[in-house]
């Protein structure tokens, strides 16, 4: 069985994610296609086969072996990345640069730059109600994105909190991420 075998819409085969954790196995994504690949995947629209990201320390066969033995892998399918939390957090932080922060008494505007070829879907989570910002954001690959935060009730700053809904470290739960403003 495969970790990414189709399940109910928006889900992946979570039992195998738990098995990887319990058995201390690296996560490996594959695709099992028996007909020409173009019948299932539309490359012209940016679709891709399921694949494995291997986070190596050196670009060599030994570097790949060492990363697999230490479970530094992620599965990439559709727009989802499935991995241990530490690798997802590092992937996100290395992908997104904060290019600019503009602040005045009533608002903060953060300009982000996504330097990767991945799309990130952010959903606002529990936060200080004096920080007012949109509920959901999509940060496209190789693009800039602005997050505008209104400051209400004499709030000077705090944490903006998100779930990155397409980065999975646990079944059906995206990576939680906070940024101090």
Sequence positions of predicted segments:
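Domain-core and long-helix interface of multi-subunit machines
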Residues: 1-43
